From Swiss-Prot:
Gene3D superfamilies: FAD/NAD(P)-binding domain, GidA associated domain, C-terminal subdomain, tRNA uridine 5-carboxymethylaminomethyl modification enzyme MnmG/GidA. NAD-binding protein involved in the addition of a carboxymethylaminomethyl (cmnm) group at the wobble position (U34) of certain tRNAs, forming tRNA-cmnm(5)s(2)U34. Keywords: Cytoplasm, FAD, Flavoprotein, NAD, tRNA processing. This is tRNA uridine 5-carboxymethylaminomethyl modification enzyme MnmG. One of its GO terms (molecular function) is flavin adenine dinucleotide binding.
């Protein structure tokens, strides 16, 4: 490594944001350096060993559509795959993979080490070099100055990180890793708007001390789903089940009796925790009427005995953790291998960023991941690919890019952050997107891969595969719109049809019937339809069956725009508005916005919530 070399882009941090940022910049052909405090922990899953879920799976598919690493790594490391919301509409269906931590790190490292234009170096960063309002490089822990034309910071929970277990606290970026204290101070000296957030993790348990007979087994799906558009089920390692258990009233009693020892409830922690991933202490206090809470018992990998009990994140003292864990069904003899803990860390107000994730104060300095106030691997990776790409585009003097809200969940994520900011760790949900019928998991490639190719992100293998898929969809749709299903075909479909056809119709129209799928149409020899892979026939079916819903949603969006200046009465009690989440009610009652437009700029108040407000105003005969 030549210390005098000028890198185009330096990425600081080797987590989920940093790895995607470094790969994206390198794919665009610029000289990229990835700095990490530990090469062995590139792509480390610091908390739960899982990828995807509601809203999050959509982000993973979009990252994959732009030729990112996360979906491919999840396929190579996933030890259980499930489609969540499988019985619901395609807009909210989401893929989730339980992952082997070791295999995931290995898959990410393999992609990094095989990427052209990318150098990896193990060094923590203590400072940025700033000259003339621009960043010119970084200073490492051992005093090396590394020069760059752009820098991407993806430092996770390491900035000013402080770990809490009971009343004990110590500096740390995560358990076993040092924090970035010097870099945190350097960034604060730049007068960037800074705050503190908190997250936590549960104790880990030795599988051999668990009685699984008291639990409900949760197998994966068959056939086994895949994450990457280039993936197949043969990419997956051995598949294993998860299990479900529950806390008991004894669990709750122990936690209630020890709340004074919780750093959260004793006022020791200043940072705000994630609303949608509360600690077990929070659950007991906030949902005092519940006699039990569900726990997902998840394996950490194929070569470890450690189990991740998803649902009991805690910062209570270790001896209290042992007590309450052993009151949970199946955990009566549990041996804790690692204590649960809370960690608080610095983040910077994302309203100080452009939509390209560059800081407004220093235009060649980019932020991605938890430094922007988000929580979750997927949210971090989504920001990473955008920040790394835009850092490279800036170097190449090309126009920067970020998807719009109607193009991608990545666009929703970034727009929410830079427009509204966040005072609590931001997690993606499908409910945050007003265009969710357009932004499905199944069509992320159709939405983004062509743009990714234009930008230089998408390689030849993905582009060739995508082009063939798109051609198959378009040519088959043309056939369906120009072919007819006749009334006399009623006999052919009599076992499937809920109601017989009354008149001839185009095949595309016939496919809109809920009981009819593409396989039924293949029964008609005169249509000459091709045999196609499931992912293509599924896309064709969805495009036809949901065409009317998508059109209606677009009309709703237009209507909503017309009502942006609708005034909201000061006396309006948002508890009376049917359908609003507790988060939205809480924020609206506290802020009391004067108009629908102002309400829409409040973090967490989605366009769907604005529609509910509009309906309430009309029903209440309040002026609209």
């Amino acid at each position: 490594m030549n210390l005098e070399q000028l890198y185009d882009v330096i990425v600081v941090g080797g987590g989920h944001a940093g790895t995607e940022a470094a790969l994206a910049a390198a794919r665009l052909g610029v000289k990229t350096l990835l700095l990490t405090h530990n090469i062995d922990l590139l792509g480390q899953m610091s908390c739960n060993p899982a990828i995807g879920g509601i809203g999050k799976g959509h982000l993973v598919k979009e990252i994959d559509a732009l030729d990112g690493a996360m979906a491919k790594a999840a396929d190579q490391a996933g030890i259980q795959f499930r489609i969540l919301n499988a019985s619901k509409g395609p807009a909210v269906r989401a893929t989730r993979a339980q992952a082997d931590r070791v295999l995931y790190r290995k898959a990410i490292r393999t992609q990094l080490q095989s990427q052209a234009n990318l150098t990896i170096f193990q060094q923590a960063v203590d400072d940025l070099k700033i000259e003339g309002g621009l960043v010119t490089g970084v200073v490492t822990q051992m005093g090396l100055t590394l020069k760059a034309r752009a820098v991407v910071l993806t430092v996770g929970t390491f900035l000013g990180g402080k770990i809490h277990v009971g009343m004990n606290q110590y500096a740390g970026g995560r358990a076993g890793d040092p924090p970035s204290i010097a870099l945190s101070k350097s960034l604060r000296d730049l007068d960037l708007p800074v705050g503190r957030l908190k997250t936590g993790t549960p104790p880990r348990i030795d599988r051999r001390t668990i009685d699984f007979s008291q639990m409900v087994e949760q197998p994966g799906d068959t056939p086994v789903p895949v994450f990457s558009y280039l993936g197949t089920a043969s990419d997956h390692p051995q598949q294993v089940p998860c299990h479900i258990t529950h806390t008991t009233e004894a669990t709750h009693d122990i936690i209630r009796n020890n709340l004074d020892k919780s750093p959260m409830y004793a006022g020791v922690i200043e940072g705000v925790g994630p609303r949608y991933c509360p600690s077990i202490e929070d659950k007991i206090v906030r949902f005092a009427d519940k006699t039990s809470h569900q726990i997902f018992v998840e394996p950490e990998g194929l070569t470890t005995e450690e189990i991740y009990p998803n649902g009991i994140s805690t910062s209570l003292p270790f001896e209290v953790q042992v007590q309450f864990v052993r009151t949970i069904k199946g955990f009566e003899n549990a041996h804790i291998t690692r204590p649960g803990y809370a960690i608080e860390y610095d983040y910077f107000d994302p309203r100080g960023l452009t939509s390209f994730l560059q800081t407004k104060a220093i235009p060649n300095l980019f932020f991605a991941g938890q430094i922007n106030g988000t929580t979750g691997y997927e949210e971090a990776a989504a920001q990473g690919i955008i920040a790394g790409m835009n850092a490279a585009l800036q170097i190449k003097d090309q126009e920067l890019w970020c998807p719009r809200r109607d193009e991608a969940y990545i666009g929703v994520l970034i727009d929410d952050l830079i427009t509204c900011g966040t005072q609590e760790p931001y997690r993606m949900f499908t409910s945050r997107a007003e265009y969710r019928l357009l932004l499905r998991e199944d069509n992320a490639d159709l939405r983004l891969t062509e743009k990714g190719r234009q930008l230089g992100l998408v390689g030849d293998e993905r582009w060739d595969s995508f082009s063939k898929k798109r051609e198959a969809i378009e040519s088959t749709q043309a056939l369906l719109h120009n072919s007819w299903v006749r009334v006399h075909h009623n006999d052919l479909f009599k076992e499937a049809l809920l109601n017989p056809m009354q008149h001839d119709c185009r095949a595309a129209e016939f496919l809109k019937r809920p009981e009819i799928n593409y396989q039924h149409l293949l029964m008609m020899d005169d249509l000459n339809l091709p045999e196609l892979p499931q992912e293509i026939t599924e896309q064709i079916e969805i495009q036809n069956k949901y065409a009317g819903y998508i059109d209606r949603q677009q009309q709703e969006i237009e209507k909503l725009r017309k009502h942006e200046n609708t005034m909201l009465p000061e006396t309006l009690d948002y508890n009376d508005v049917v359908g609003l989440s507790s988060e939205v009610i809480q924020k609206l009652n506290r802020i009391k916005p004067t108009s629908l437009a102002q309400a829409g700029r409040i973090s967490g108040v989605t366009p769907a919530a604005l529609s509910l407000l509009l309906v309430h105003l009309k029903k209440s005969r309040l002026p609209v």
